[in-house]
């Protein structure tokens, strides 16, 4: 084969590479445009997403560690290497031009950049189909969930009383040792309780059907702890990870929250709502206790805010205290709840203290970065932020009341 034929064949090969990228880019652009239709997004999550999630989650569940976390680290290193190499290569070419020397072509650099481009396209593809389209749909996949109706004081009080009773009863039902401390099961048993509850809710929310992989403790749990992050679901590998220093009591609500993301409910209000709902409706007494503790204080705050808005600070607080007195027999033992919560946090702190943390000197920097991240997430999420989970919780129980069920 002559030199000219080799060159022509090489050009054809490059042309094929470009054509494939262009074709993939066009398909991506079409679905990106479709993603701005919430009806399409809901259809996609209900019909296509479960197939993708089932396959991808099964593949990465094979690994005993969080592959998504490792990929994230490799991605960060690759980005740094790419930036440094590109800057050095650019300076080198500029110097040769200034000296009026022909710039040498780097086959290695060009090949590397082609690979990087393919990787970038793959990630854009996965984030579009694994996260962006599900995230853009209606809240809970239901247009009605976005109506955001207001609730009266009486309605808040109804749900508050309902959860108070569950909270009180679950305090008595949880297994305790001779010192009155809660006896927690291992993570496998606890997660089985989470899965059962999520699957029980699948009649109401069909997206919760299907395959559930095993949550994995994050290697960077200490960093997550400094940043105030309990867990993260990796969209590209469909893996649930959690901060291993999370308290055993809160762990149930956290994993239910992350599992909701795992099933396509990616908005934070959806995750917050599903975390509380799955917990309070669980058949596991510790999980019920965890969910009631979480939702009880959110509902108390919502009820108090409604009273203050209507009657002013002083009178509103007086009425709230009056409600507490009138419903005293329905109320949980808040001192016991506080002790249980502190016991769980102390155990988590002991686990943290038992491990080495070589990056601990950067904990303040991580916390500052987290503050920026939380503020940014709140601005982007807007009305779909965590605090809207209480409104969805109210929607559910008021809907159940209207149907004559609890």
PLM region descriptions:
Residues 1-13, 89-110:
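Membrane-interfacial, low-structure loops and terminal tails that flank and connect transmembrane helices
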Residues 175-240, 244, 248:
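Auxiliary, metal-adjacent structural segments of Zn-dependent hydrolase domains
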Residues 156-158, 163, 266-313:
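Post-HExxH zinc-binding segment in Zn-dependent metallohydrolases
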Residues 64, 253-272, 276-277:
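Active-site recognition of the HExxH zinc-binding catalytic motif
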Residues 132-203:
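Membrane-interface segments at or immediately adjacent to transmembrane helices
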Residues 329-406:
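Pan-zinc metallopeptidase signature
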Residues 26-92:
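Membrane-embedded alpha-helical segments of integral membrane proteins
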Residues 104-135:
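Internal/C-terminal transmembrane anchor helices
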């Amino acid at each position: 084969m002559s030199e000219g034929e080799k060159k022509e064949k090489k050009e054809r090969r490059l042309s094929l590479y470009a054509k494939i990228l262009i074709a993939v880019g066009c398909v991506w652009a079409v679905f990106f445009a479709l993603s701005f239709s919430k009806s399409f997004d809901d259809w996609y999550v209900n019909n296509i997403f479960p197939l993708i999630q089932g396959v991808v989650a099964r593949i990465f569940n094979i690994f005993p560690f969080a592959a998504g976390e490792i990929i994230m680290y490799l991605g960060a290193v690759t980005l740094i290497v790419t930036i440094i190499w590109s800057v050095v290569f650019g300076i080198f070419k500029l110097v040769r031009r200034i000296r009026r020397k022909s710039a040498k072509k780097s086959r290695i650099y060009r090949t590397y950049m082609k690979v990087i481009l393919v990787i970038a396209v793959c990630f854009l593809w996965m984030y579009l189909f694994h996260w962006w389209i599900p995230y853009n749909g209606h809240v809970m996949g239901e247009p009605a969930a976005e109506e955001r109706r207001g609730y009266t004081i009486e309605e808040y009080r109804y749900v508050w009383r309902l959860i108070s009773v569950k909270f009180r009863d679950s305090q008595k039902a949880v297994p305790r040792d001779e010192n009155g401390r809660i006896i927690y099961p291992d993570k496998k048993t606890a997660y089985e309780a989470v899965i059962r509850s999520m699957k029980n809710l699948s009649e109401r929310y069909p997206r919760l059907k299907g395959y559930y992989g095993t949550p994995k403790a994050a290697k960077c749990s200490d960093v997550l702890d400094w940043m105030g992050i309990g867990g993260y679901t990796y969209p590209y590998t469909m893996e649930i990870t959690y901060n291993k220093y999370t308290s055993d009591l809160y762990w149930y609500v956290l994993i239910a929250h992350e599992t909701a993301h795992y099933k396509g409910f990616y908005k934070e209000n959806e995750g917050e709502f599903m975390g509380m709902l799955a917990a309070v409706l669980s058949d596991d007494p510790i999980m019920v206790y965890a969910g009631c503790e979480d939702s009880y204080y959110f509902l108390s705050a919502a009820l108090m805010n409604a009273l203050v808005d209507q009657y002013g600070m002083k009178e509103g607080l007086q009425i709230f205290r009056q409600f507490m007195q009138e419903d005293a027999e329905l109320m949980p033992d808040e001192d016991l709840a506080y002790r249980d919560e502190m016991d769980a946090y102390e155990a988590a702190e002991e686990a943290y203290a038992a491990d080495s943390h070589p990056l601990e000197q950067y904990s303040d920097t991580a916390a500052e970065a987290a503050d920026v991240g939380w503020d940014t997430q709140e601005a982007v999420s807007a009305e779909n932020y965590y605090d809207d989970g209480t409104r969805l919780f109210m929607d559910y129980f008021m809907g159940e009341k209207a149907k004559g069920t609890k």
